[in-house]
Amino acid sequence: MAGLFDSGMIGKTRIRNRLIMPPVATCYSDNGYVTEDMVNYYKRIAEGGAGAVIVEAAHPWQGIAYGSGALGIWDDSMVEGLSRLSGAIKSAGAAAFLQLGHNGPQASENQVSPSGIPYIRDTSPKELSIAEIIDIEDGFAAAAVRAQKAGFDGVELHGAHFYLLSCFLSPLMNKRTDIYGIDSEGRTRIVCETIGKIKERCGRDYTVSVRVNAREGMEGSIDGDELKAIVGHLEKAGVDVIDLSSNDVSFPAQLKRCTVGTVSIPRADAPQGIFTGYAAEVKEYAKVPVITVGKITDKEFAEELISKGTADFIAMARPLIADPDLPNKFLNGGEINSCIYCNACIGAVARNRRMVCTVNPDIK
């Protein structure tokens, strides 16, 4: 059985250990362009011993993100800054991946969705035509080419948390009656075709991850059977790893603003490893590696997840924001600057402000 600090493979990319920094928005960008603050932030996480860093969602189009602090990849002029970013991460020994995302019905303007169903109340997202869907697939592929030119080891398609691709995957949000809906094959088509286009343009060996919701916590949404079907279709399309999140944390207060009353962020009182049971479920049938996430904080717990085969890799977001040296401290010992799960980091970004951290004085 593998150990927490054994290397592992994601596609053709070797990862030095099983600890991964997942994509979390920082608002450190300057109108889409990489800044020195962003480079330093991610380099610091890599220096702390993470096996891989998945950089926050970069947007292949203007006008689909939250604001000026969101990272972009819509123009060739952005490649230079992204190259500095990937280079800084890899110089510290971590693999570098870049998430690609389209906010869809959660965009600050020009909201779109598979079926015109809103995520944010009092908005009317446009239902995408087939021609527009194909353009979006091509836009993701063009962004992947830029990411490859910038030196990233691979890309991740953001298919979770009710952003655009997530809405296509979800029976709750996708009510289309054409080839991009109806059943799991149709609902996954946009993601599968995008994987194919990325592999065609970047090479079959270029690593592609897809982040998906294991559950969505509402009637008519993704359940265990639907998840199994989604993973099967993604594997046939050539996905290299499943980054398994979930969106079934009950949050009724959100219904004042949104049409969905669940979120992906475990609260402070949530049990450790809240989503890891879903990873164990997927490991029963998946042929590609599985990344798990969800309030994983203790070394012994993390070691057990890997040694028992619950997951192949562990993503730790808020714990690595609070203490980027956590992987090295797991390995060598040392007092950990523990996350208190106050969500100051996420709250700031949700207001389109720079990430802050209550317990890490370097993030302010």
Which stretches of residues belong to each language-model region?
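Flavin-dependent oxidoreductase catalytic cores
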Residues: 1-364
